[in-house]
Amino acid sequence: MVSLVLAALAPAMALFSYVYLRDVYSKAKMFLVLRIFIIGALLVVPILVIQFAFTEENVFPHPAAKAFLLYGFLEEGLKWLMLFVFAYQHGQLQRPGDGILFGVSVSLGFATVENGLYMIAYGLEAAIPRTVLPTTAHAVYGIVMGYYIGQAKYKEDHKKMFLLLGAILPILLHGGYDFILSSFGHYVLYAMIPFMVILWLLAIWKLKKASRFTV
């Protein structure tokens, strides 16, 4: 059991450390980061219940609808809502870059529990290869989401646009990831590898941009 917990936590902690050590935030308190991480973790069960019910009823028979609505919209929409309520509205963003730290926290909290459940179901050896790409992808969704929520807090003239981008872009990225995974069959790696490269280039770009903003 200890090995399962450590294996589930390791990818998330590595990615979180990467973002944390880049110093894109300033004075974000770690207990707030931990709270948002836990909130992300608690989202897993209700989301999985909804996804299971919708899948059983075949609500979204087309792979694209399932990828973008049942996975992208549901997961990223709820994560965005948690960030909006617990970070944005409660005044926890002390500078624009702090949004990235909170965005990564909620995403990796979700990914950690998701990984743990997968490992319990399929075993450690079968699960480890599966956890690397999804955890990385979740981190990127969180970076993009947090970047735009942070911008919305400090750029009042374009607040609505940034909040909207903070929701829509992660939904599209997540939906694209799941659509590739479910629809490309034997050719999935040919599509997934360049897609992941694009994701990480996008994440690095947002991290660099966020590090230049101060208030």
UniProtKB/Swiss-Prot annotation:
Keyword Transmembrane: yes
Spans through the membrane: 1-23, 31-53, 100-121, 130-151, 180-203
Localization per record: Cell membrane
This protein's UniProt keywords: Cell membrane, Hydrolase, Membrane, Protease, Transmembrane, Transmembrane helix
GO MF term (any one): peptidase activity
Membrane topology of this protein: Multi-pass membrane protein
Enzyme Commission identifier(s): 3.4.-.-
GO biological process terms on file: proteolysis
Residue ranges annotated as Cytoplasmic topological domain: 24-30, 122-129, 204-215
Enzyme class: hydrolase
Pfam families per record: PrsW-protease (PF13367)
InterPro entries in alphabetical order: Peptidase_PrsW_arch/bac, PrsW
GO annotation, cellular component aspect: plasma membrane
Entry keyword annotation includes Protease: yes
Topology feature Extracellular, residues: 54-99, 152-179
Similarity annotation: Belongs to the protease PrsW family.
Reported function: Involved in the degradation of specific anti-sigma factors. Responsible for Site-1 cleavage of the RsiW anti-sigma factor. This results, after two other proteolytic steps catalyzed by the RasP and ClpXP proteases, in the release of SigW and the transcription activation of the genes under the control of the sigma-W factor.
Protein name: Protease PrsW
Species: Shouchella clausii (strain KSM-K16)
Gene field: prsW
